[in-house]
């Protein structure tokens, strides 16, 4: 999708570890694992989380060094309530396995919310669709490619 759209990007492969949190469904482990393996600051490597807000599935893209604030996300999208999607639902909606969920080229179109700290960086890394593969690009290019909105949805 990025190549077809003429969006400059680089793909980075690494050997994924099995982070402690990954086995329990804690998505913090995958992003931190990618950052360590690629020698990057965790604030540059984003995790893509599938969230349900008032029944609608959407993607929250936040730095791996931060935690999603579901109340902030709900307020940002005008929802009464937001919760993490069940892993099975996340995989079905995106076409990717948990730990490799990308905001790019999902199975079905999903709303994408990019966190303010990630949008402020020169370059971010997001999953390229599988564990062990990241793609780096400018936040503005990601916003343009997926129609993302930028909101303050995380805490330290």
Feature locations, PLM:
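Extended, low-hydrophobicity, polar/charged segments
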Residues: 1-156
């Amino acid at each position: 999708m990025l190549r077809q759209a003429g969006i400059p990007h680089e793909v980075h492969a690494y050997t994924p570890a099995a982070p402690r949190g990954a086995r329990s469904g804690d998505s913090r482990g995958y992003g931190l694992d990618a950052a360590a393996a690629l020698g990057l600051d965790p604030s540059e490597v984003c995790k893509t989380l599938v969230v349900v807000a008032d029944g609608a599935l959407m993607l929250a893209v936040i730095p791996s060094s931060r935690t999603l604030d579901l109340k902030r996300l709900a307020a940002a999208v005008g929802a009464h309530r937001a919760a993490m999607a069940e892993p099975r639902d996340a995989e079905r909606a995106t076409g990717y396995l948990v730990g490799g969920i990308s905001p790019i080229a999902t199975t079905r179109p999903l709303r994408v919310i990019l966190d303010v700290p990630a949008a402020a960086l020169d370059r971010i890394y997001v999953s390229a669709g599988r564990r062990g593969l990241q793609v780096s690009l400018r936040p503005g290019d990601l916003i343009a490619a997926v129609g993302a909105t930028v909101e303050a949805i995380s805490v330290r």
